[in-house]
């Protein structure tokens, strides 16, 4: 059996339905207004922080009937670590969504975001002294080639654009590419920081990390206050959509945005639950299948351009990622313990 148990079908369903619906709703928003990236990011962060807040509350039973909140769960990870993670997380999230404002096609956007293996290996080998097997190096080469093929297939035809007087399209695409590259490396750095943090404080800290990383990011959106207010007005002015079951009508962009933020939370929770209940191989396989389905839906439903070169790049990225997940453990050369590690180990011995 590929799946470890029938219980894993629940998070798999959450990933397939939640993540695919999230991509569809995002593309529906971007089709109507390409400049909605910041508003979408803000509502995603606010929604996840709000829902996660209730997961992090400590409850006390009263009279064997009622439960009352008595405060937040004890936070194990220090604030300075969260500040570092939040800063990186906020910047990469904004970069990923803002890249969609720069003529980056949704299928290419999904493929590129699936290729973080490249930056993870580069950063891991340079800063964390990790060594990789031949199969892992081969996986890296495949992913790199996949990125190159996908990039060339998605680039605007410069000769055609110049002849039409649309030179900015190629420039915008290049800016979007730089945003995605920066976000890819930041994502890998964040992943390695989280991996190190979970080693120190326990792997069961994900509910805490989700809450604080989104909550502490919200003040940063004050930098984009005018942009957010402008797009809230655009949402209010969008065409009305008839709601099912006789609930009247509601502005279309608000409907898409609500669906987007709710499905993103379902998607995130599905990934976390699946990671805890199945093997890394199963998790990687499910996520890769989900991303491939999202690309197919984007191409068919939204009539996005999908060349043979882009298809080849897609296969190389997913196959390379799958090979890497089956290649065994990465060998880490021991680093000298930091002051923080020494303090934690000393505390464990005393307890």
From Swiss-Prot:
GO MF assignments: UDP-N-acetylglucosamine transmembrane transporter activity; UDP-xylose transmembrane transporter activity
Protein name per UniProt: UDP-N-acetylglucosamine transporter slc35b4
Keyword Transcription part of the UniProt annotation: no
InterPro entries named in the record: SCL35B1-4/HUT1
GO biological process, any: UDP-N-acetylglucosamine transmembrane transport
Subcellular location: Golgi apparatus membrane
Organism: Dictyostelium discoideum (Social amoeba)
Transmembrane parts of this sequence: 6-26, 37-57, 77-97, 104-124, 136-156, 173-193, 209-229, 252-274, 282-302, 306-326
GO CC, alphabetical: endoplasmic reticulum membrane; Golgi membrane
Keywords: Golgi apparatus, Membrane, Sugar transport, Transmembrane, Transmembrane helix, Transport
């Amino acid at each position: 059996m590929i799946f470890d148990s029938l219980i894993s079908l629940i998070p798999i369903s959450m990933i397939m339905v939640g993540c695919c619906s999230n991509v569809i709703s995002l593309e529906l928003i971007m089709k109507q207004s390409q400049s909605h990236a910041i508003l979408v990011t803000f509502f995603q962060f606010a929604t996840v922080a709000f829902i996660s807040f209730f997961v992090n509350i400590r409850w006390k039973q009263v009279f064997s009937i009622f439960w009352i909140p008595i405060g937040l769960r004890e936070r194990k990870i220090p604030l300075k670590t969260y500040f570092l993670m939040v800063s990186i997380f906020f910047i990469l999230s904004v970069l990923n969504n803002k890249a969609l404002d720069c003529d980056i096609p949704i299928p290419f956007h999904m493929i590129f975001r699936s290729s973080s293996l490249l930056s993870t290996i580069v950063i891991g080998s340079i800063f964390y002294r990790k060594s990789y097997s031949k199969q892992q190096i081969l996986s890296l080469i495949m992913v790199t080639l996949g990125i190159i093929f996908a990039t060339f297939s998605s680039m605007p035809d410069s000769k055609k654009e110049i002849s039409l007087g649309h030179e900015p399209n190629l420039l915008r695409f290049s800016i979007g590419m730089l945003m995605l590259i920066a976000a890819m490396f930041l994502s890998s750095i964040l992943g390695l920081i989280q991996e190190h943090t979970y080693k120190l404080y326990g792997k069961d800290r994900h509910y805490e990390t989700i809450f604080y990383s989104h909550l502490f990011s919200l003040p940063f959106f004050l930098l984009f206050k005018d942009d957010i207010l402008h797009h809230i007005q655009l949402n209010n002015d969008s065409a009305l959509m008839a709601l099912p079951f006789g609930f009247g009508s509601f502005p279309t962009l608000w409907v898409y945005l609500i669906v987007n933020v709710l499905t993103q939370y379902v998607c995130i929770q599905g990934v976390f639950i699946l990671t805890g209940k199945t093997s890394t191989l199963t998790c990687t396989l499910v996520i890769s299948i989900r991303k491939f389905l999202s690309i197919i839906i984007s191409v068919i439903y939204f009539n996005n351009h999908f060349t043979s070169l882009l298809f080849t790049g897609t296969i190389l990225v997913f196959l390379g990622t799958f090979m890497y997940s089956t290649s065994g453990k990465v060998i880490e050369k021991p680093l000298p313990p930091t002051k923080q590690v020494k303090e934690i180990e000393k505390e464990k011995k005393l307890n």
